[in-house]
Amino acid sequence: MPELSRRRALGAAAALAAAAGTQAVAAPAATAAGHHPGPSTAATGHHPGTPASFDEVYKGRRIQGRPAAGGHHQHHGGGYAVLIDGVELHVMQNADGSWISVVSHYDPVPTPRAAARAAVDELQGARLLPFPAN
């Protein structure tokens, strides 16, 4: 039996980590692929898995979220619009499915609703100003 060296131990650990990472990525992708039985993206105009609409008052601020109609280039959130007191909060969905906003872009959250709540927390009562469009 060959002697166990540091090089062999690190090589084996790297191989195990790569195998575990591949399996961890492949399993959710396989589950998600067969998990959207509904109308196609072309039929609805929205991406599968688009978050549900919401309209609530959070800490005295009205936050709303809904699929954006026709916002292909303006909305990087996969066609989803978030409003705080009627002013649009620019949101974007990351490749991993998390969401960020222009107010709290270093703190990814799981949903647009959570992004709106995080923005309200960060604003601390200040008014949200419209994001300038170029």
From Swiss-Prot:
Post-translational modifications: Predicted to be exported by the Tat system. The position of the signal peptide cleavage has not been experimentally proven.
Keyword terms, alphabetized: Copper, Melanin biosynthesis, Signal
Pfam families: MelC1
Signal sequence extent: 1-32
Keyword Signal included in the entry's annotation: yes
GO molecular function: copper ion binding
Family: Belongs to the melC1 family.
Protein name: Tyrosinase cofactor
Organism the protein comes from: Streptomyces glaucescens
